Amino acid sequence: PIDPEMCTRCGACVSVCPENAIDASFQIDLDKCKSHRACVTECASIGAINFERTDQAREGEFDLILDLQEIPSIQISQKPQGYFAPGPDPFEQSMAASQLMGMVGEFEKPKYFSYNEKICAHGRNGQVGCSACIDVCSTKAITSSFKNGQGKVEVNPNLCMGCGACATVCPSGAMRYNYPSVAYQGKQVKTLAQTYLGALKSTKAGDAAPSLLIHSQKAGTALLDHLGRAARLHPKETSGLPAFVIPLAVEHIASTGIDLWLGSLAYGFGEVLLLLSGDEDPGYRLALTEQVDLTNSILVAMGYSKRIQCITANASEDIAPVSKVMSELRQRKAHKLLANPASFALSLQKRETLETSLEHLLQFAPQALPAEGVPLPAHSPLGGLIVNKDACTLCMSCVGACPEGALLDNPDEPQLSFIEKQCVQCGLCEQTCPESAITLSPRLRSIEHRKEKVTLNKTEPFHCISCGKAFGTLKMVELMLGRIGSHQAFSGEALERLKMCSDCRVVDMMKKEL
């Protein structure tokens, strides 16, 4: 009944209560209260006590929140900055309070991402296509937004913790990580590869390639420090990093993806190792595992061996799995170069970087890709489409739904064309097609085939039986006549009128009325 925000802590209610039902915390024990309401009378000028008041949900914006509930209001692996939920332990509560007291002043928070709505494949025509970034975000910072049938995603920068997983799983590159960007990381990787390979030129191991070990800045660095100390103290039991393994620290391990990995291989690294140090959200581990499987599938399709590997530890002190992998690498020795080191720079555009890296690796691939391509996992951003020509009426709904311009129509004749290089396998065309005539086909084909504009379906135009003007496709009109031709409303002359263009139908109806 006592509103803590209105209460002035004067203590008048405590003094006048005959049952001593109000304690020093200014809470009323309703089991003791006999409803004399002397406290209400005493507090009339303030109005802080009201037995008729019901619980109301309140909203507000705060920089710092101390949640003392046993079950916190926010239950996600990465809590927002400024939110503390220490639980019921008094010691943890005091530690959280101490941290809060020190958080005074103004702080700058980087904007980790940039978003290009134009190439986002989230939604068109009221249909949802890709929602990979929404599904993977552990802080729930990304939400879906539709306006006039057009879908996009919105990111709350205050909830974003900079993991970068959204950019890793984004097939189109609409979501881009900027802390740092792939272009900046590409310069780092290129410099590391060139320096290492340059030092090996004068040795017999000139064709050996270094291994790139990517790890998170905080937990990953701590894990490698533990590994290094253990290897110095117990060299027989613990294996440190071999000389050909080059570590690279990033803000968060989930921020790296297929574009940086393939770019690293193109620059001269023999393999890419991803160190998971135990502080990642389970969803991030799953996403990285899927991306690793996809990248290895692409490499195997080109005739290479699997060159991307996850090293999974459960904490920064869990050095055993890392030591085991390092021991295996030391015995195996360094990989050979996959291809001549590339000279191109990684782009800010994910698809451009991906295509450039693929083209370089395909140039030196041990085997050529078959014309029909090699199947890839279902979550692949690369692939084509299969169109059921018997079901397709060439209504071109798919063309209007495609956000990447992979599907094209022909203004001169009923024809559906496709450029596989542009397709991100978002599924919007499949969702939009009224005849369910489109099926996604994740696969890897040669660069020449992927750049080629191919015709998926075409038919003859239907001409108005009155004026001869083309106003639809032959298949569409035949399908329409087959579906509604038996209805009594379209018998006789009315059925023939369906074979006319819109102008001639009006003229024909006016003639019949006159």
Where on the chain are the PLM-derived regions?
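Terminal amphipathic helices with adjacent charged low-complexity linkers/tails
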Residues: R37, F146-A193, L286-Q291, I308-N314
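Large, well-folded core regions of big proteins
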Residues: C163, T191-L213, L223
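Mobile, glycine- and charge-enriched loop segments
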Residues: A219-A254
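Cofactor-cradling patches in redox/metallo enzymes
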Residues: T256, L260-D318
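Conserved acidic residues
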Residues: E61-I65, S211, V245, G270, ...
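Long, compositionally biased charged/polar accessory segments in the mid-to-C-terminal portions
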Residues: L241-V245, Y267-E271, L276, A470-K475, ...
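Ferredoxin-type iron-sulfur electron-transfer modules and their immediate structural context
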Residues: P1-V136, K140, A209-A222, R285, ...
